[in-house]
Amino acid sequence: MERKRHVGVWILVLTLGTVIAQDQDLHLKHQYHSGEISIPPASESEPFLRKFSPALAVAYMEEGATAWTRERKCLSCHTNGTYLVARPSLTRSLGRPSEEIRNFAVQQLKEFRSTDLEKLRSGIRPTQVAYLAQGLAEWDAHVTGKLSPETEDALGLMLEVQGESGDWGNTDAWPPFESSNYQSTTVAALAMATAPGWLAARGQDGAVEKMKRYLQTGSPHDYGRLLLLWVSTRWPGLLEGEVKQALVENVLGHQRKDGGWSIRSFAAPEEWGRGNRAEKLRSEDQFQDPPSDGHQTGLCLLVLRQAGVPAADPRLQRAVKWLLSHQRESGRWWTRSLNTDKFHFITYSGTCYPLLALDTCGLLAPR
């Protein structure tokens, strides 16, 4: 009897191991997969498109977020979190964003509300709450034009998990999204500044003032400074004019000869998170001269446009030219992960940001 029991246990272990291996194998064959949605792995060797295709980029944006939401059933900063904060501002050009993903965000809000507050303040959860709040705020700003009860609730919860220093907690291992409290605090700030009428109604709120001081007095690396500039474009008075202009010049100073930007030039390897990716980054064959990538080129162009740099500026025109000539056949733009050379999920934001940036330059025709 005992022997049969052991045999049964081993059969169960082997069966579970096979199922897990098959699941891992499935994910390795795709960057995103769910039902009929199948997006191949991201690769630097993927061929370029001969002509810019907004339709392919949008399909990648929509299908990637949908597949992640259905399969992973979690709010991730790099995929459906990015969709939530990016897609609504393209409503005028692309139509309404996915109701399915907004509904998922609302359900996540309910689950967060039922979570113990101390647990919610740990790990990446404060950052997830900030992304959720910003995503709902963006929907209100660009889709309905008015503050929704769900957004107000999300912002309230976001304040409940704010840290003593005025920041929002994060992990420190998965740059650029899950690597610093400064990054997550810029997300929270964008949520507050974007929600229709919310910030004005708060007045001299203590929590808001603590957050402002945290952002104004922090010493982030240049990627964090880029995010601070982004916040300042929506938050009048957050920065003095000369400080804001210095941030603009700092971004332009990183532009490469080909017109693009490289995320790797915005922080030393040891400055990302707790420095746990430094060995990987320093071992890359292009470490001394990192190439331009979709994530950083799109983000820099987007922020510079929102900071008031004209689309006709020759430096921005060079960036536009780079984006139009570097889209891949899948519709995405390539960006090598700062973390592992496996899924390269950063190509997702590295496609959303170029779309947003090109839209600010009038290159996506309104519907």
Tell me the role of every PLM-derived stretch.
Residues M1-K4:
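N-terminal secretory signal peptides that target proteins for export/translocation
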Residues H6-V9, L132:
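Short amphipathic alpha-helical "recognition" segments used for binding
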Residues G8-T18:
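Bacterial N-terminal signal peptides
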Residues D23-F52, R70-R96, T115-G156, G163-A207, ...:
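An alpha-helical repeat/solenoid feature that recognizes helix-turn-helix modules
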Residues A57, M61, A65, A105-L109, ...:
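Buried hydrophobic core positions in alpha-solenoid tandem helical repeats
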Residues G95-T115:
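Active-site-surrounding "flap" and adjacent substrate/cofactor-binding loops of secreted or lumenal enzymes
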